[in-house]
Amino acid sequence: CFIQGVDDCIEDIMELARSEAMLFKFGSGTGTDLSTLRSHREKLAGGGRPSGPLSFMRVYDQIAAEVKSGCKTRRAAKMQSLKVWHPDILEFIECKAKEEKKARVLIEKGGYEANFNGEAYSSILFQNANLSVRVTDDFMEAVLADKTWATQWVTDAAKAGPSWPARDLLGRMAECAWGC
């Protein structure tokens, strides 16, 4: 497996997509920390809004789904992580569990097959990567002390992003991991 980096620019974001596809083609796996990509809450230099790491995770997920490992039948091996200080951390934590809920509805109410290669799972997102939150000692200390955890902007670490009770955030990590 290869650990890859990505810079916060569209050229690098798309280069990562190409690089992952080629690595999958030749039978390898990849892992990428997406904490370098600014939050959807931040601003672009031209005044617009970025789409955030989750939007590009959708693209990377589809590449992993379509380019099988070694161009055979085995699924691509893929990991994505986000640091616990990232402003989009809650959306990252919850994204796969939300998609799993959709799959359950499709299976239970729509009559779709429950196997992983069936239509229910092929129609939802975030199924082709293991997602990991990169926690810090500071975060774990905030959990133990029952403190609020503040995120920070990617582009300006001095600027505070959203905050949550640290224990609640850790609880969501456990609940969402269990739900998948």
Tell where the protein language model's regions lie, with residue ranges.
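Active-site cavity-forming subdomains of large catalytic enzyme subunits
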Residues: 2-180
